[in-house]
Amino acid sequence: MKIGVICGGLSSEREVSLRTGDAIFRALLKKGYNVVKIDMDRNIAETLKKENIDFAFIALHGKYGEDGAIQGLLEIMDIPYTGSGILASSLAIDKIMTKKILKAEGIPTPNYIAFSFDENPNFEAISSEILQTLKLPVVIKAPREGSTIGIEFVFSKQELPKAIKKVLEIDKQLLVEEFIEGVEVTASVLGNSNPVVLPLIEIVSKTRFYDYEAKYTPGLSEHIIPPRIAPELSQKAIEYARKTYKALGCRGFARVDFMIDVRKNEAYVLEVNTIPGMTATSLFPDAAKAQGISFEDLVEKILMLGLEGRQK
């Protein structure tokens, strides 16, 4: 079996994807697999045809990789692949759609308001609507970006127009959420129809917020296992993570990010990553390690889950 690790790509998360792809490629080589690394570009269909792979290990993040696009191409070409399918991928990458599903399923998520624009937006009108709907502080997000790209924290009325403008440079949609102060926790989920939640991780950023720099610079964030929260809150997060994974129809592996409000004794789902980072500073491999699963074994497990029910 020839495996192609598809990485790089055309999104703003290209650099992270190359690092993820490289780590996966080396792990599969160590395990003795016949493996090639494929840097995705506009000619990906021709490359896949030329390489004639039997299985694709998707290591792409963001646009065209995590949104159902590459999954659709692989389905057409009859190449089985790792992770979630077209629908789950396209739903999970869209934070607004994810929140609608979470609300419908009764899974706690921060209150929000969403906007969509085709023409010049009226920043004052948007600011006014946000202030009528939510209390400050708020978090403004580009709904289809990952790696904490396109996120602005707003603490005063005066900051709103500038923050809105900044996020709209990235996306034509806006997701505005209430800011929940608490403990940031992530749940790594592994499996298909019977998913398992690996040990929860508390994220402590050395910068003010867990942003792109804190996420990918060694030493700028700390991963604490188990999180320093009450056991019943950990249990809630595990239950909501599994429920979220199933509600979106995820497969293989995914990471569900939470904000834990200790005062309200609640775990709020923020978002779902259907292709979590697999770099040296990544959360998913850390959770697996805490469960006694080596990086190489984790990569092989994800590969096996991708093959389950998908062999040619």
Swiss-Prot record:
Binds 2 magnesium or manganese ions per subunit. Its EC number is 6.3.2.4. It catalyses: 2 D-alanine + ATP = D-alanyl-D-alanine + ADP + phosphate + H(+). One of its GO terms (molecular function) is ATP binding. Keywords: ATP-binding, Cell shape, Cell wall biogenesis/degradation, Cytoplasm, Ligase, Magnesium, Manganese, Metal-binding, Nucleotide-binding, Peptidoglycan synthesis. Pathway: Cell wall biogenesis; peptidoglycan biosynthesis. GO terms for cellular component: cytoplasm. ATP binds at residues 131-186. InterPro entries: ATP-grasp, ATP_grasp_subdomain_1, D-Ala_lig_Van_CS, D_ala_D_ala, Dala_Dala_lig_C, Dala_Dala_lig_N, PreATP-grasp_dom_sf. Mg(2+) 1 binds at D257, E271. Cell wall formation. This is D-alanine--D-alanine ligase. It comes from Carboxydothermus hydrogenoformans (strain ATCC BAA-161 / DSM 6008 / Z-2901). The gene is ddl.
